[in-house]
């Protein structure tokens, strides 16, 4: 089980990223646009710097939905490897069978 503080920190980052995503995209479009003037770009960069760092989607960490484990994460299932194995053994994931030889 992951530390609750780390899981909550990641939840906070996801919430902030969602909140500022539209504003962030607008500012990045102005910065990358060849039609915008130098002053507009500079002003957009300053506004982008005012957005909290945790609002950046890059700072998010994929975590297991059950245990919060950050490593061994399978995107397709949203689970860490050990939770995925446990769920597969119990037959909780349709169509997934563990191989044995």
From Swiss-Prot:
Bias-annotated ranges (Basic and acidic residues): 1-10
Superkingdom, taxonomy of origin: Bacteria
Keyword Ribosomal protein in annotation: yes
InterPro entries: Ribosomal_uS14, Ribosomal_uS14_bac/plastid
GO cellular component entries: cytoplasm; small ribosomal subunit
Disordered: annotated segments: 1-20
Entry protein name: Small ribosomal subunit protein uS14
Organism: Halorhodospira halophila (strain DSM 244 / SL1) (Ectothiorhodospira halophila (strain DSM 244 / SL1))
Name of the gene this protein is made from: rpsN
């Amino acid at each position: 089980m992951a530390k609750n503080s780390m899981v909550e920190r990641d939840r906070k980052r996801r919430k902030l990223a969602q909140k500022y995503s539209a504003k962030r995209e607008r500012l990045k479009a102005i910065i990358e646009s060849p039609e915008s003037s130098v002053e507009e770009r500079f002003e957009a960069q300053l506004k982008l710097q005012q957005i909290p760092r945790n609002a950046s989607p890059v700072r998010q960490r994929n975590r297991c939905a059950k245990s919060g484990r950050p490593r061994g994460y399978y995107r397709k299932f949203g689970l860490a490897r050990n939770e995925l194995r446990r769920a597969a053994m119990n037959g909780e994931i349709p169509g997934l069978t563990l191989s044995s030889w």
